[in-house]
Design a protein with these regions (language model features):
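Substrate-binding pocket helix/loop in short-chain dehydrogenase/reductase
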Residues: 94-101, 105-110
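Conserved Rossmann-fold cofactor-binding substructure of NAD(P)-dependent oxidoreductases
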Residues: 59-76
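Rossmann-fold cofactor-recognition segment
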Residues: 47-62
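Conserved glycine-rich Rossmann-like NAD(P)H-binding loop of the short-chain dehydrogenase/reductase
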Residues: 28-44
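Active-site loop of short-chain dehydrogenase/reductase
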Residues: 5-6, 77-81, 131-139
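Hydrophobic positions on the long internal alpha-helix
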Residues: 67, 84, 123-127
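Conserved glycine-rich cofactor-binding loop
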Residues: 14-15
Length: 139
């Protein structure tokens, strides 16, 4: 008897580590729901396990709410086994210096906190029931 297919939700999936994470879980036959500000490359979407991509700006609370609603509609009654918060931002100054407490604008810091802290918090809360059903984990 085979195990039911597990489902992963991954943010920041359009390139780099996110794209590699999709490949890793796809090779293990997980169904994958992704989110990024940009559409992923077309060759990625040919993967049969990459089942649903939602374009969303996770800095914006309304966009997150819309994303959660659409993803939950796609999930239906199925459980969620993993939420990987890969989307993030670490801006640099014009001289390639990382944002620090003595440099950078407060608006940049607000954006960093919205994306790197509040978005994962909102997503964990938004998918809590689906994650509980799947005994899922949040990364």
């Amino acid at each position: 008897m085979s195990q039911p297919q597990k489902t992963l939700l991954l943010t920041g999936a359009s390139r780099g580590i996110g794209h590699a994470t999709v490949s890793f879980f796809s090779e293990r036959n997980w169904q994958i729901i992704t989110c990024s500000r940009e559409s992923p490359p077309k060759e990625c979407l040919r993967d049969p396990n990459w089942s649903h991509h939602i374009t969303a700006d996770l800095v914006n609370a309304e966009s997150i709410d819309t994303f959660v609603k659409e993803a939950k509609e796609f999930l239906g009654e199925r459980p969620l086994h993993g939420l990987v918060n890969n989307a993030g931002w670490s801006p640099k100054s014009p001289i390639e210096e990382r944002l620090g407490c003595l440099n950078g604008s407060l608006d940049a810091w607000r954006t960093v906190f919205e994306l790197n802290f509040f978005a994962p918090l909102r997503l964990a809360r938004g998918f809590a029931s689906s994650l509980t059903k799947g005994k899922g984990s949040v990364v």
